[in-house]
Amino acid sequence: YSFFTQRENYLLNPLLLGTAQFDGASQITGLELIQKMGIDTLSQGKEIFVPITNISIFADITEQCDAPHEKIVLLIDNTIPPIEMYVNRLKELKQQGYKLAIRKLAVSDFENYREVLKLMDYVLLNNRKIAIDKAKIYFGKLFPNISLCAGNIDTMEDFERLKETGGYRFYEGKFYRVPITKGQTDVAPLKGNYIDLLNIVNSPDF
């Protein structure tokens, strides 16, 4: 489960910018929902990818969410430079039991990010720019503990092709959010709606 791919597109929906949904530079998007609903409800106990920024990486994550650390994968990108201050912070988070992932790295960035990549559990690769066969050889030799994830998958056809090729552990992109209209079924209300209603009813101000 990934909060990164669940984010709203503010270019297409500019009105969302006025909701204060992501206010607070040190607040990490997604942790409040994990704290409120629990990992079992959100992802059936599986790992959850949570994006962090070059500022929120220094936040007290445990204070924002007390979920099991090993179930939370903190996702960084190339806006976090591979300098000592950030490498040390990533080491601290790793020692606390959190898992780490990185995305938006070009092949030319790999060498500069060597110390960062040593700490990563996952790396999200742009499947349109990086050949998986070469990536498997590179990471297999230098970073054998990293699991490869295919990113930026737009269509179900691309997903099926990449799955057939193999080499990736996870797949991320728009493909799984496209509605499939084959057949008909009844969809149960989202459990989160019940939790929200219960919280409102139990509120002292209700």
Regions found by a protein language model. Give the residues of each.
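Bacterial c-di-GMP phosphodiesterase EAL domain
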Residues: 1-71, 78-88, 92, 199-206
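General structural signal for secondary-structure boundaries
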Residues: 6, 53, 130-133, 179-181
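Generic preference for well-ordered secondary structure
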Residues: 18, 34, 146, 181-185
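Short, well-ordered helical secondary-structure segments
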Residues: 37-39, 158, 188
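The catalytic core of metal-dependent phosphodiesterases that act on cyclic dinucleotides
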Residues: 66-177
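Conserved alpha-helical "signature site"
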Residues: 164, 174-206
